[in-house]
């Protein structure tokens, strides 16, 4: 058996470097920035054009490493709309290949279990941008998405998008220039960004002179390891929470962790609710419940904080943000986990979250979530949240995990992914601890696989996090791998 690596030291190093390229570049955001030009038509960010040139797939599409249809659709629409502004032969050839892909694959997304964020806003917007550029796109095949767009915008009070923060900030590039300008007046952050979104920030530059927004994008460009632009920036609180949780769950206490725990306590003590970044004005249930769960596992009394989660309670589930079109399995599982520190007091809320999660179960065994493409991510968080309070929901999950493990010890797409394998191990450990699994042989097989991938570089991780396009959060993948290896060691 491979000897266990120094996982505590690796966790300490990870926590000390969280501010280094927290998320990968992706096509969607890079395309919006590639389209920015000066008055002479010269691109403001030529490195973004180069990134698009070198990240088109052989079939003409753009998007993540794994062929997730909705990601390929939105990413390809964004790329061809942006590149259609340029006359270079390579750009024209790339656009034509992208258009051909869209005609050949415009229906693929309908059978996919995934949708990207703001999908119902992005597709109509990008189709319109392509039409204005003279591209021959299969727009008539997406009329039902236009109806979803109308329905989503109809749920928003007329005054809300400009007078108070809303989730539209994150996708502000998809709203009218007039609404974007009103949002910028109130919600553009001191660092120049809006909505933690490079694409939305690029829209501020596109629709008018905004030196602060351009300076923000230039700072991102200077830090980019490959010339592309990330899905989210800044996103420091989200990254901190999701990096800490597996480490704390595994019982690791690396050097420096107390400082990070204090950061979460300070946020909750000050506001009661948590956002994904100090620059983002809208708190959410996911980051809030995550912070509470981490602190509870680390020994903090979170009882005074828990009532704040009731802000997100609805008739039949808990929402992450107001005005969402649908709920999230992982968010409801996380809220149930947070409330499980006071299971008697919050029994109705745990039951409500469990009921929603039960309705989303697939084949009686596993789940998908809107924020991540892997069923192992969603299923792991259900196991974390409900194995101790609602074990009946998970009675067949261990069998599903056993049956879907690959011969090489991994789980997941394309014959196995380190991130998916780590979440499968974390899920199985939770089931074992709850008495819902007894066969630990999958854990020993996974251990060798994860050891082999412990030192993978950032570009070797597939994009599985779900934004308007898919992206990778390498620190979170490594945190899950380190923690899974630490827990698996106990079963060797």
Q: How should each PLM-predicted stretch be described?
A:
Residues 1-2, 20-47, 64-96, 108-140, ...:
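An alpha-helical repeat/solenoid feature that recognizes helix-turn-helix modules
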Residues 221-227:
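Terminal amphipathic helices with adjacent charged low-complexity linkers/tails
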Residues 11-15, 52, 98, 102, ...:
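Buried hydrophobic core positions in alpha-solenoid tandem helical repeats
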Residues 10-17, 173-188, 225, 363:
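Repeat-mediated protein-protein interaction surfaces in helical alpha-solenoids
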Residues 55-56, 108:
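Short, small/polar-rich motifs associated with maturation and membrane association
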Residues 4-9, 176-178, 267, 309-312:
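Helix-turn-helix repeat elements of alpha-solenoid scaffolds
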Residues 58-62:
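Nucleic acid-processing catalytic cores of prokaryotic defense/repair systems
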Residues 261, 265-269, 273-277:
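Outer-membrane beta-barrel channel domains
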């Amino acid at each position: 058996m491979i000897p266990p690596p120094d996982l505590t030291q690796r966790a300490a190093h990870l926590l000390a470097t969280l501010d280094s390229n927290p998320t990968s570049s992706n096509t969607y955001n890079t395309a919006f920035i590639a389209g920015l030009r000066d008055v002479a038509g010269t691109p403001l960010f030529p490195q973004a054009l180069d990134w698009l040139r070198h990240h088109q797939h052989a079939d003409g599409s753009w998007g993540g490493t794994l062929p997730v249809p909705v990601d390929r659709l939105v990413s390809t629409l964004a790329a061809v709309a942006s590149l259609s502004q340029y006359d270079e032969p390579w750009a024209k050839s790339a656009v034509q290949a992208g258009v051909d892909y869209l005609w050949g694959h415009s229906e693929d997304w309908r059978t996919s279990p995934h949708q990207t964020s703001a999908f119902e806003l992005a597709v109509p917007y990008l189709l319109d941008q392509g039409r204005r550029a003279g591209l021959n796109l299969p727009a008539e095949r997406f009329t039902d998405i236009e109806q979803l767009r109308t329905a989503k915008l109809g749920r928003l009070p007329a005054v809300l998008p400009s007078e108070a923060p809303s989730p539209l900030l994150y996708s502000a590039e998809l709203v009218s220039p007039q609404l974007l300008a009103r949002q910028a007046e109130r919600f553009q952050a001191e660092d120049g960004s809006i909505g933690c979104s490079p694409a939305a920030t690029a829209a501020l530059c596109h629709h008018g002179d905004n030196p602060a927004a351009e300076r923000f994008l230039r700072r991102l460009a200077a830090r980019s390891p490959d010339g592309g632009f990330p899905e989210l920036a800044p996103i420091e609180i989200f990254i901190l929470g999701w990096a800490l949780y597996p480490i704390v769950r595994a019982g690791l206490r690396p050097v420096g962790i107390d400082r990070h725990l204090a950061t979460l306590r300070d946020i909750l003590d000050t506001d009661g609710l948590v956002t994904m970044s100090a620059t983002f004005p809208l708190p959410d249930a996911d980051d809030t419940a995550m912070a509470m769960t981490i602190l509870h596992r680390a020994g903090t009394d979170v009882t005074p904080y828990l009532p704040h989660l009731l802000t997100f309670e609805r008739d039949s589930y808990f929402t992450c943000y107001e005005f969402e079109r649908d709920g999230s399995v992982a968010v409801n599982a996380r809220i149930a986990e947070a409330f499980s520190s006071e299971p008697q007091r919050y029994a109705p809320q745990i039951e409500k979250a469990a009921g929603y999660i039960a309705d989303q179960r697939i084949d009686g065994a596993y789940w998908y979530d809107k924020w991540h493409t892997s069923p192992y991510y969603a299923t792991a968080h259900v196991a974390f949240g409900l194995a101790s309070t609602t074990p009946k929901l998970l009675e067949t999950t261990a069998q599903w995990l056993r049956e879907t493990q690959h011969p090489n010890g991994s789980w997941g797409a394309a014959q196995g992914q380190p991130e998916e394998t780590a979440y499968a191990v974390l899920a199985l450990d939770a089931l074992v601890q709850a008495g819902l699994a007894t066969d630990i042989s999958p854990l020993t097989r996974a251990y060798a696989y994860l050891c082999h991938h412990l030192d993978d570089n950032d570009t070797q991780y597939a994009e599985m996090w779900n934004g308007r396009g898919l992206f990778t959060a390498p620190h979170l993948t490594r945190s899950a791998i380190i923690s899974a290896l630490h827990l698996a060691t106990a079963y060797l």
